[in-house]
């Protein structure tokens, strides 16, 4: 069950990338795995993060990230390097083939979804269309 928003996320359309079938709908970079582990250290009652999608922004869709205390019945579960990410039923098709990364700079830090299925993004990178 999701409890609250964890972080903001940026979406990037990846052009010219070949889709390579994987077992998981979503793959995590080592930086994303490390950040998720760090976030969950302070939340012993939470078992992972939940990725969802909602109507928002100038391009229509936006990803959401929440803490998850359990896997809901229709969630897809991704387990990688000791962390669990649950994908909400409504977000499953939009995340196929996506890589979840965590990027830090001097001014910001955020999860980034590198999604080859996105047709367009807004200027700020927070919303996308498929």
Swiss-Prot record:
Fetch the InterPro entries from UniProt. Fe-S_cluster_asmbl/transfer, FeS_biogenesis, FeS_cluster_insertion, FeS_cluster_insertion_CS, HesB-like_dom_sf
Against Pfam families, the record matches this protein to: Fe-S_biosyn (PF01521)
Question: Which coarse location class applies to the principal site listed for this UniProt protein?
Answer: mitochondrion
Tagged with keyword tRNA-binding: no
Q: Which UniProt keywords apply?
A: Iron, Iron-sulfur, Metal-binding, Mitochondrion, Transit peptide
Tissue specificity of this protein = Detected in head.
Organelle targeting sequence: 1-24
Mention one GO biological process in which this protein takes part, according to its record.
response to magnetism
**Annotated protein name in UniProt:** Iron-sulfur cluster assembly 1 homolog, mitochondrial
Tell me the organism: Drosophila melanogaster
């Amino acid at each position: 069950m999701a409890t609250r928003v964890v972080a903001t996320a940026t979406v990037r359309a990846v052009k010219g990338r070949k889709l390579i079938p994987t077992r998981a709908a979503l793959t995590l970079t080592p930086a994303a795995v490390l950040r998720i582990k760090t976030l969950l250290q302070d939340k012993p009652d939470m078992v992972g993060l939940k990725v969802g999608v909602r109507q928002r922004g100038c391009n229509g869709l936006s990803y959401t990230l929440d803490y998850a205390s359990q896997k809901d019945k229709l969630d897809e579960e991704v387990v990688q390097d000791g962390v669990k990410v649950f994908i909400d039923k409504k977000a499953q098709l939009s995340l196929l083939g996506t890589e979840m990364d965590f990027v830090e700079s001097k001014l910001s830090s955020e999860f980034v979804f590198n999604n080859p299925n996105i047709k367009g993004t807004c200027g700020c990178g927070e919303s996308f269309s498929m």
